[in-house]
Each structure stands twice: as structure tokens, then as C-alpha cells.
């Protein structure tokens, strides 16, 4: 499988001041760890990473000092006001490793006429091989009638994937549309 390659610079400075200067220069401070390797503190190009981060559970080839390693973005710290990435935690992985991650759900279709679908959870936790991580799991609500509930156990998973979320975790429910009642005007 082909993954985007990101050139990373080894990071020598630490602390809030260094991180601010790095972000001002268009770099994102990050750390990669796992696979019984020493943590590697790096700087990543902000523009390239913001494009890669549009996908959930993004995998990429991290190129540090002429050696490439496959990494999974584990945690993203964002500045909510300026909507910028402040820091990334990444996990070194092999394609055949099994990882437990939260996979987003994509809802398709429309429920039966006269009903409304209420989404209770937008992701589920699953364990699967790194090479099989989907961008999203599809939940089809087409033609569901009032009173129907969709649980985590109802979601179709990729081959070899195991559901970690509780099987009875409510994902969505279909309820009848409530009609507005006309109230008599006050006297």
C-alpha cells in the first residue's frame, strides 16, 4: 500500500517558546513513539499535514534522516480559537500490526417518511490490522421505520476487525416526527 511521505526534521528545542517559533515558521511539533523504539521528537510541514489530516486515522511514511517509518496519527492537539494544529502524537506501526482505534461512522440514506434519525455516536472503537483501517464505516439508515435502533453490533466491519465498543452501544435511533400542536390563544 502507498502512503504519503512526509519529510520530518529532528527537533532539538523544546518548550512553549520553541513550539511557538516552529509554528510561526510553518512547522508542527510532533513526537513519534512505539514498537519499543526511543521516542523521536520532530517538526513536520504544517501545510502538508493539514491536507493529510483531512482523513481520519491517517497513516503516513515519516522520513527522518533518510530512514522511513510507517506511523499512525494517534492524537492531535488543536488551538480551538485559531483552528491550527499545535502538536501531534504519532505511533510507529507495521502494516501487519493490530491496533485499536476509533473509526468514524458515515451515515447514508434516509429513514422512512414521517421519521427523524437521531445520531447518538459518531464513531466506534475497533481492533484491526493497520493495512485495513477504513476512512469510515458506513451505516445505512435507508427505509428504517419509527422505533428502530442501530447498535454497534449492527455495523458491518472489515474482515478480521473486532468490535471493541460495547455491542449494545446505541449508534442511532429512528423516531416519529412530532407534530406541533396548536394551542388556543390566551384570553
UniProtKB/Swiss-Prot annotation:
Top-level taxon of the source organism: Bacteria
GO (cellular component) term, any one: cytosolic large ribosomal subunit
UniProt keywords, alphabetically: Ribonucleoprotein, Ribosomal protein, RNA-binding, rRNA-binding
Record carries keyword Ribosomal protein: yes
One example GO MF annotation: structural constituent of ribosome
GO biological process: translation
Coiled-coil segments: none
InterPro entries recorded: Rbsml_bL25/Gln-tRNA_synth_N, Ribosomal_bL25/Gln-tRNA_synth, Ribosomal_bL25_b-dom, Ribosomal_bL25_C, Ribosomal_bL25_long, Ribosomal_L25_dom, Ribosomal_uL5_bac-type
Known partners and oligomeric status: Part of the 50S ribosomal subunit; part of the 5S rRNA/L5/L18/L25 subcomplex. Contacts the 5S rRNA. Binds to the 5S rRNA independently of L5 and L18.
Described function: This is one of the proteins that binds to the 5S RNA in the ribosome where it forms part of the central protuberance.
Family per similarity comment: Belongs to the bacterial ribosomal protein bL25 family. CTC subfamily.
Protein name, as recorded: Large ribosomal subunit protein bL25
Organism: Tropheryma whipplei (strain Twist)
GN (gene name): rplY
Amino acid at each position: 500500500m502507498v502512503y504519503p511521505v512526509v519529510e520530518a526534521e529532528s527537533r532539538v528545542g523544546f518548550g512553549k517558546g520553541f513550539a511557538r517559533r516552529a509554528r510561526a515558521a510553518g512547522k508542527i511539533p510532533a513526537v513519534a513513539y512505539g514498537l519499543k523504539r526511543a521516542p523521536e521528537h520532530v517538526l513536520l510541514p504544517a501545510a502538508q499535514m493539514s491536507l493529510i489530516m483531512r482523513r481520519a486515522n491517517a497513516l503516513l511514511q515519516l522520513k527522518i534522516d533518510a530512514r522511513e517509518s510507517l506511523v499512525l496519527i494517534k492524537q492531535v492537539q488543536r488551538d480551538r480559537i485559531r483552528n491550527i494544529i499545535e502538536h501531534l502524537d504519532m505511533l510507529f506501526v507495521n502494516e501487519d500490526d493490530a491496533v485499536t482505534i476509533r473509526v468514524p461512522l458515515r451515515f447514508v440514506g434516509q429513514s422512512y417518511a414521517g421519521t427523524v434519525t437521531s445520531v447518538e455516536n459518531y464513531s466506534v472503537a475497533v481492533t484491526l490490522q493497520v493495512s485495513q483501517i477504513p476512512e469510515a464505516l458506513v451505516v445505512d439508515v435507508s427505509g428504517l421505520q419509527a422505533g428502530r435502533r442501530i447498535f454497534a453490533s449492527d455495523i458491518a466491519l472489515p474482515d478480521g476487525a473486532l468490535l471493541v465498543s460495547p455491542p449494545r452501544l446505541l449508534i442511532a435511533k429512528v423516531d416519529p416526527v412530532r407534530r406541533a400542536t396548536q394551542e388556543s390563544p390566551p384570553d
